[in-house]
Amino acid sequence: MVDLKTKAFDFSQNFTISLDGPAASGKGTIGLILAKKFSLKYFQSSIVYRQLAFDCINQKIDVTDIDAVIALSKELNLDNNFDLENEDIGNIASQIAVISEVRNNLNKYLINLVKTTLRIIMEGRDIGTVIAPDADLKVFITANPQIRAERRYKQLQAKGKTCILDEILRQIILRDKRDKERKAAPLLPASDALIIDTSELSAIEVVEEITNYIKNKLT
């Protein structure tokens, strides 16, 4: 872990950033820009849940069959070329993420990835509180649900996908409720996280704020 008291911070050394927040808050775009700026490996923790959701669909496993979902979570394989970003998969991923045993199994994969990667920014819901509590920098991104729904709508439209704004908003509100109320690692910022509301900010403006924070606090 980086010594926060050092006066000459060297970005060539080991460095871990946790980037948490609700769905469609802008984490992905911000994380990718930060990863490029500071030469970090970028990883979305949601991919492991989306992969499991895809596997459930592919193997015709009902998400209410908890034992079957738990068993499948022990055999995770991320090596595929399928599109995991559609809203149906995201909704199922949110449902299975509330299963404690599933989170425990997938968290082992994520924790090991953080420990074995020297320079990484990991994005998710509980990275700063569960996966990487010793991260050098913890950031929590949030935004108004309506703004987030509009962002997701534009993203999907840009990919040529058919979508309905009201339905996206409904799903975001539902996922927020599920994420915040789940017993296993509910969505909340770490006590020492930098919290940024991106409702009125562009991704570049958020990156600038984080960069200034790093320069002021970590150097």
Curated annotation (Swiss-Prot):
Q: By its UniProt entry, which InterPro entries does this protein fall under?
A: Cytidylate_kin, Cytidylate_kinase_dom, P-loop_NTPase
Q: Where in the cell is it found?
A: Cytoplasm
**What does the record give under GO molecular function?**
ATP binding; CMP kinase activity; dCMP kinase activity
Enzyme class (EC, first level): transferase
UniProt main location, coarse:
cytoplasm
The biological processes this protein is annotated with in GO are: pyrimidine nucleotide metabolic process
GO CC, one annotated term: cytoplasm
Please tell me whether the keyword Membrane is annotated for this protein: no
Record: residues binding ATP: 21-29
Q: Which CDD domains match?
A: CMPK
Enzymatic reactions: CMP + ATP = CDP + ADP; dCMP + ATP = dCDP + ADP
Under which EC number(s) is this enzyme classified?
2.7.4.25
Q: Mind listing the UniProt keywords for this protein, alphabetically?
A: ATP-binding, Cytoplasm, Kinase, Nucleotide-binding, Transferase
Task: Name the domain of life this protein comes from.
Answer: Bacteria
Similarity annotation: Belongs to the cytidylate kinase family. Type 1 subfamily.
Record's protein name: Cytidylate kinase
Query: What species was this sequence derived from?
Result: Rickettsia felis (strain ATCC VR-1525 / URRWXCal2)
Q: Which lineage is the organism of this entry classified under, starting from the top rank?
A: Bacteria, Pseudomonadati, Pseudomonadota, Alphaproteobacteria, Rickettsiales
Q: Which gene encodes it?
A: cmk
